[in-house]
Amino acid sequence: MFFPNRWKLREAALFILNTLLRDFNEVEQQVPLELATGFTECIRYCLHHEQDFLRARGYLVAGVLAQTAGEGFQQTAASYLEATLKAITGDASEVVQVACIRVLQDLLPALPSSITQPMQIPIISAVSEFASAHDLRDGTDNDDLKVTLAETLRDTIMVESNVVLSSPALDVLFNVASNGASNFHLVMIVTEAFEDIVQMISQQGTDAYVRLCEKVLPSLTGAIDVGNLTQESALTVLAADLLRALAENGSEPLPNGFVASVMPKLNRLLLGSVDAELIRPATLAVRHILAHDFNQFLAWREPDEGKVALETVLVIIDRLLGPSVDDSAAGEVGQLAAELVEKAGSEKLGPYLPQLLQAVAQRLATAQEAPFIQSLILVFARLTLVSAREVVDFLAQVDLGGQSGLNVVLSKWLENSVNFAGYDEIKQNIIALIKLYNLEDGRVAQVQVKGDLVIQDTGRIKTRSQARANPDQYTNVPAHVKIIKVLVEELASASGNGDVDAAAAAGLEEEGSDDDDWEDVPSNILDLSLGVTKQELMAYGEGGTESTFGVRKRDDETQGFLLQFFQEASTKPGFQELFATLTPSEQDKLRNLG
């Protein structure tokens, strides 16, 4: 490796070494300390070479070597960290500066916090100085640079998250993000990093969260204003999603003035936008505000027209439930409505409560997208947890285009329950259905819903055109029978035997809506061309996780609840007759309960 005046060969050799070391690091393998030490002289030579590409490569190898050489190499790695930081501001080559910013992502996790924590402020200052000296405005030619800056800032902050309270770290991160808000990868990095930061700060108590809000709220609300003025929708979406993260992990109660700072912006967005990417996080932000500090929300008035808070949020919900907003954009309105009903109750909502519930039922009748349907159903499910009888009484007297509200809601509810996603949501739904069943209300039993799929075995593959001409046929069953069918299915899912959860199934159904000639054939082959991480691939081999591949894990709590229900239900009059109407497969599942 020591050929004078042949730097390109050295740089090529270092490139190969860098690749090999990264492969070692990816599989969590270390190189022997003696071998790592043997590279130090070469690295030192490269770091002082006149050729900037060789210097840059030397820093890159130094970083990955620090990660793979183990604790015995930390003293040398610490010297690399100091040299890297100096090069960011002191090296004349931009190539070297960018390489050093990237190398920090390798060096920081390779060293103990006793070394890296004192370096946080200097690193943030160096990255800030670099960012200020360069034009980071939107452009594909610098997208990679902005991603590198954001990742390095994220890793620096994560050494000790409190640094955001005493430094411009988040200002620099937001500046990088605002100049690349249309870059999905960059936005994802910044959003996920901010979520982690807010969670860590909020866990330290109210005082720390208040200081965080004082630091970031002016930037976030200002970004919404700038995005509106410049019509940069991507910037507005980013700011709204960061506000959502801030509210979601907020303290209880929220800091004084939080609602007054945030709600006017969110109200304007939710009443004026049709962009689904903007409406969803803004809706969730309002929902989290209600959840964390309903009293502060109630005390707020809309400044332009002087509307009280309840009226303001009811107008928002009414607009999102209306025909001008599609299913995708309105996907979170059900959660907002449910939160409002729970927090305000009939005492505060008064005559608005039945109007609100009727509007939810009306939109549920026409909803098509699974997440939106789930969101609306959960409004009634959460009310059922409190008073199932009142929910049935209300829906029975509601008229929806000539149909009983009970018929409309129960049909949609029971047909889509198997598609529910999210452990909390699934548990709420299961308990609500059990409460409905235990009412033993004749009005529920009179509602006819879709039962089992009628299998038509023609021996031929069914094309899409044939499926449209001859849609699937289902049996009709009473609602209380369908509840049992759903709960039997949920019992199997809670035991961890389900292969794919509802969200994945719904996604497959939506993919099948293209105008191709043939049905998609389900496959167990893993497509290695997909952009998934090694950890996700390993998780797939081990059975997956709900968040990764939509596979539901075993849920002992839910399973125990269902077991108790079936044990009690089986002793009641009429259950044996109901049992006889189940499919053989469903009967076997219940028999296996013992």
Question: Each predicted region: which residue ranges?
Answer:
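Karyopherin-beta/Importin-beta family HEAT-repeat alpha-solenoid scaffold
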Residues: 1-594
